[in-house]
A protein has these predicted regions:
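Catalytic beta-strand/loop cores that center a nucleophilic Ser/Cys/Thr
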Residues: 2, 34, 42, 55-56, ...
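Residue-level recognition of short, well-ordered coil/turn positions
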Residues: 38, 85, 114-115, 207-208, ...
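Short aromatic-enriched loop/helix-cap "lid" or pocket-rim segments at secondary-structure transitions
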Residues: 24-26, 99-103, 186-187, 222-225
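Helical hinge/lid and interdomain linker segments adjacent to catalytic or ligand-binding clefts
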Residues: 10-99
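Extracellular ligand-binding/catalytic regions of CAZymes and related secreted enzymes
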Residues: 2-9, 35, 189-198, 204-273
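A glycine-rich, often tryptophan-bearing local segment used as a flexible ligand/cofactor-contacting loop or short
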Residues: 68-152
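Stable alpha-helical elements in mature extracytoplasmic
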Residues: 25, 29, 73, 117, ...
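Short, solvent-exposed loop/turn segments at secondary-structure junctions
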Residues: 18-19, 67, 94-96, 178-181, ...
Length: 273
């Protein structure tokens, strides 16, 4: 029935921020969205501007890093999800970073801090990025092998940023990794051995957020504060077919409420006719 629905589905996509190849991520996600011709996507670089389009949106997709928003926008994002919509949040969406120079710290070195300056935003997402160890290969485990979002997906290894999170509320974890050790360069850099969410669902009243922490990417020109030409192009999990499987399934998941609504409206129209 879902494939027979011909009505338009509206997506708001926020792609912007720092230290990542946003152009690459934006294009890859738009290509997947375009596989369903019913999806019409409006693209924004920040949440405050995107908030103006949320009233007409059926679902929200985000790939950002260090993009903050006003309290009113945080409230609107939470209300959007709480009202029954879905938000697919990728990689650095939950990241707010502040670089502390040696004179700002007691440690005598450059450190990265994760300020708790957007509490409602992070509560809606269900997590906030705090740190990651140096990029290196790690194993992603399937927490719920029978979950439809990871049906047929087996544990895999990726070279990516292993996100260490502060969580909010109850998370339905679908993929996780195991880690304990140092996240060098971060203020909160000491972590005990434990499981860390990689792919999870967070319920917000009638709606849900799906979060996937994987997906770091960086090109030659994405670190202008530090260098005019970054020597390495980093694609991390984007090099893996399984990552595109998770992207596609997440986007299919995100549009389910819209399809259910359109189907119900069509049935009502048939009854009236």
């Amino acid at each position: 029935m879902a494939d027979e629905i011909k009505k338009r589905i509206n997506c708001v996509f926020v792609a912007g921020g720092a230290w990542h190849d946003i152009d690459f991520a934006r294009l890859e996600i738009l290509k997947i969205l375009s596989e369903d011709e019913r999806i019409r996507t409006r693209v924004f670089e920040d949440y405050d501007t995107a908030a103006t389009a949320l009233d007409e949106a059926d679902f929200l997709v985000t790939y950002t890093c260090n993009v903050t928003c006003s309290v009113s926008t945080q409230e609107k994002l939470q209300a959007f999800v709480a009202g029954g919509k879905r938000w697919y949040a990728l990689h650095g969406t939950n990241s707010i970073l502040r670089f502390l120079t040696p004179k700002d710290t007691q440690y005598g070195e450059l450190l990265i801090e994760a300020p708790r300056s957007q509490p409602l935003f992070m509560e809606t997402l269900g997590s906030q990025f705090i740190a990651h160890p140096p990029v290196a290969p790690f194993r992603v485990e399937v927490t719920q092998p029978n979950h439809p979002l990871v049906e047929g997906v087996e544990a895999f290894e990726t070279t990516d940023e292993l996100y260490l999170l502060e969580t909010h509320g109850v998370l339905d974890v679908i993929l996780h990794c195991d880690y304990g050790g140092d996240a060098k360069g971060f203020v909160e850099g000491k972590w005990e051995q434990q499981q860390h969410p990689v792919f999870y669902i967070h319920e917000v009243d009638k709606g849900q957020v799906l979060y996937l922490t994987l997906g770091h990417c960086r090109g030659h020109y994405d670190m202008p504060e530090f260098t005019d030409y970054y020597p390495t192009v980093e694609r991390c999990a984007w090099d893996l077919p399984v990552y595109y499987t998770l992207l596609r399934r997440g986007l299919e998941w995100a549009k389910i409420p819209a399809l259910e609504r359109i189907s119900a409206e069509a049935q009502e129209d048939e009854v009236k006719a």
